[in-house]
Amino acid sequence: MTKPRTQLIFLWNYVEWGGAQIFLLAIMKAARADWDILVVLPRGSMPTILYFLDDLGIRYEFLDVAIQVSEAPGLIDKIRRQWRRIYAEAVSLKYLMRFDLKNSILHIETAPWQSWLLLTALAMRRAHVFVTMHNFMPRSSKLREMLWRLRLKFVSGLPGFHIIPSNQDTKDKLSGWVRDDFWEKMIVAHTAIDPTEIDAALESEFVRSETRMRHGIDPDNFIVLCVGQFIDRKGRWVFLDAAKQVIDKDPDVAFVWLTPKLPDEAENARIVEYGLGNSLNIVLSDSVGKAREDVLRFFRVADVFTLPSYVEGLPIALLEAMALNIPSISTRVYAIPEAIKDMETGILINAGDSEGLADSILRLKRDPELREKLARNGRKFVLENFDERVVAGKVIDSYKRSLEGK
């Protein structure tokens, strides 16, 4: 008789998708042959992530609740957001009670220093819980940081609980915030790329001028691309400020931002103030195609990739751009220097430095030999160090050890 497959449940409580979901999809790809996989996500989730799940043949179910991930500007908004998070976690816990958690793996996207009550309740059910941390917590008041430290010390002592840092920077910074024995056992499972998808995107038929024109991009311009959510922590206004500086000096440069969600009315009003006109195109990722290969192929419209983030782990979009042979510029924050070695595999600038970003873009435009060097070295470094098949194997091994009580 065939042994039933072990249940592997992935859960997140927000409708947006990004690098965190790409990280989990890599694990699903590697695990789907041997595990019974279920994804639990909010109703109303962006269609692209559902397409990715369908493409992999992954079963999913919806919860009728979602948290707010955008910034809460006022005190009342912050209180509402916290209450919504607590309510969403209560709904999630009630849903999860139908499963044999003692003999399953639960991999959830949550902040363990906030969701300690949920994690405690799951530990009482003898669940095997894994949480990915893509970056260390943002700096806050001494009182709040003390509270976070106490909570992390507590949850790191819960049986069956695991944190998987997706980069070395996050693990290093967690030292002293979690129990020492817990920290020693944490494995780093880097954000990573799928080399087969990268090669497929590079080898597939692609006419750059036609793709550019199809999305309103001048086919003859030097294109600077950013990919990710159009939000503050990704450095969106730094990107636009640098764009204005560059275009004032060289009007043959244009800027493109590929995003899963277009700006709202207030954001568009602020964008207009930069006066970039046709030199800026914000493109909805759904419009370039539904498959991962479609998104990766779109990267090839770019001459240079940049991600001027303030807060970031090890961003998948940056690794993908580098693997696709695109010279890349990003910020020396969190784990980004684990991929970009300044002037060797890319260019590093300080977060918030729009002038530095503009200068780096112009330098690359004027120096094709430097572009070729950074593109070649960047691709080689990513392919050698950030292969998702290796990373997924490490995570799945951790699942198995947890079930074995190790």
Predicted regions and their residues:
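A conserved mid-protein helix/loop that constitutes part of the nucleotide-sugar donor-binding site
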Residues: 18-26, 222-245, 355
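Short His-centered aromatic/hydrophobic patch
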Residues: 108-114
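A short, active-site helix/loop in glycosyltransferases that binds the activated sugar's phosphate group
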Residues: 158-185, 190-200
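Nucleotide-activated donor-binding/catalytic signature segment of Leloir-type glycosyltransferases, i.e.
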Residues: 268-289
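Short alpha-helical donor nucleotide-sugar binding micro-motif in glycosyltransferases
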Residues: 292, 297-302
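Aromatic "clamp/platform" in nucleotide-sugar-dependent glycosyltransferases that forms part
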Residues: 310
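Short hydrophobic beta-strand element within catalytic cores of glycosyltransferases
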Residues: 327-330, 340
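Conserved acidic donor-binding segment of nucleotide-sugar-dependent glycosyltransferases
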Residues: 342-343, 347-354, 363-368
